[in-house]
Structure formats: C-alpha cells, structure tokens
Amino acid sequence: MKKYLLFLLTMTLFARSEAFEINKDIHEFAANMESCYGVPASKVEWWLYGTDIKELALNRTAKPTEAKPWGEYKKLFITDDRIRGGLDFYLANEGDLIRAEHQFGVSRYVIAAILGVETNYGKYQLKLRAADMLATLAFNSPNRSAFFTKELQWLFIIADREDVDPLTYKGSYAGAIGYPQFMPSNFDSYGVDFDGDGKTDLVNSMTDAIGSVAKYLSGHRFIFGEPIAVQADVSGDTWQKYDSRSMRPLRPLKELTDNGIIPRGDFLPDTKATLYTLDGADGKEYWIFFNNFYAISRYNPRVNYAMAVFSLSQEIEKAVDWANDEGVYAE
C-alpha cells in the first residue's frame, strides 16, 4: 500500500511539473501579447486554457500531403469531379471572379483553382478549431514553433479587434481559416471586404474570399497575361546544371533554350524562367516555371501545390470555354 501511495505521489508531482512548464509558457505568451499588442493577458490566458492539444496537428505537419510525388498528388485534385466543381463554381461566381481579375490583375481561373484546391470551392466542412491547432503547434512543434507562435498571436489580435471568440474560428490542421485557408497573418494583411458589407468574412462570404485570394496573389507579384508554367523537353549534356530545384525564375529563357531545354510553346526569350524536374505518373517531367508560378507558390511553398493550382486553373478555363460554346449557364 505504501509503495502504491508513493507511486501516486510521484506521478502527481510529475504531472504538476509538466503542467507548470505549460503554464509558464502560457504566462509568458500572454504577457507578451499584452505588452506588445495590447491584448489583455487575462483574456489570452482564458482563451488558451480553453484550447486542446491536438496530435493531428503535429502528425499532419510532420507528414504533409504535398510531400507525395507529383504523379500521385495530381490525382487528388485533377479529377472530373474537381473540374466539374470548378465549372459550377465559376458560373455561380463569374461576376466576382471577373471583378477581382480586373481590380487586382490576377487570372480568374487561378483564383477559382486556389479555392478549389484549398476547400473544394467552399464545400469542405471545416470542423477543427484554428486556436487548438495553432496552440498545439506553437507550444509543441519542434521545428516551426516560432512560425506558429506568430500565427497564434495574429489570431488573438484579430479576435480581440473584432470582438470575436477565437475558439469559434474553424480551420485546417495547420490553423488556416475560412474558404481561402488564410493563415491569421494573411487574414490581416490580405483580407478584403469584397462584398461591401463593412467586414471581412472569409468564413461565410465567398465574395470576400475571392477578392482576398486575388489581393494575396497580386501582393506577391502575379501579373495578368504573363505565362505561369510550361512543360519542356531536354536534350544534350548541359541542361542538368539548370535543374535548380528552385521555383524562383532567375535566368532568361534563352539561356535555358541554348542549353537544350525547349519549352512546348512560344515565349519571349528574355522572360525569366527556371527548370524543375517532377516525378510524374509516367516518369520524369521537365517543367519551366515563370514569375506567376512563383507567385502562386507564395500561397503554399510546395511545388506540388502550385502545380495543382496551375493544372486545375487550365482545366477550369477549358471547361468554361466549352460551357460558353455550348451555352451552359449557372443553375
């Protein structure tokens, strides 16, 4: 009996020690929120004590879907259902998409594709609390704690400013919010009241989501009418040195073509470009990325993500052209 009581006492002390460490982190975070951003520490602590640690956040960020080979990842998004959904979405929101294209200089098909990849055009039912995910990753992520701490700060800043309970924000396993899956810092920087109702609502207003995606891409130097990406053929023995594994276009296209990297299309020779090799379903695929591809990658810095958006945008555009030819309209 004494040994059992000693065991219970030891476990209790251990539990208290673990809780103390968590509380200490929370106190420091809350104090910083008040001193740096004016959000009362007591309010921040109350919010944090209402959050739950979610193993899902740690597991999914450690093994993101985007890490799959392109040939596998492509099958998740370039499907008949996703393309048909993109056509339906476009027809239902054409006015807002065209207005966003004109105002921000961003392809309406790319805007639609991002919303298609992020939340299947708003059809996904977001059930996870963004505060749970961000708090878990801020206090427990071994590699990206600083990033998620910043995003948790922004979530609380926005909630305090808008007088909203942050525990009501629904999001992804990484804490992204609403139809466009904006991280809280992007919500603040690029959120747009595109429907003119006096507030930016990325959770319930698809019009606001469309404008916000366009503003984000415009802010990352997407330029309407310029190329995004094109598949290429390679030959010779010098092209390999240009396979940079970087999505940032830094060399003139002519330098690539002079070294056996030939785009499947006509482009201005001085256009900045980069070569990237992907593992496709049928083997290696060679792609030339331009500035607009890099702009898309700023939404999510994984090449598979940007490729999915680019590919889906092309399919949506083809579907819209078909619908226009056939006289198909939104129901």
Short names for language-model regions:
Residues 181:
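Functionally critical loop-and-helix segments that line ligand-binding/catalytic clefts
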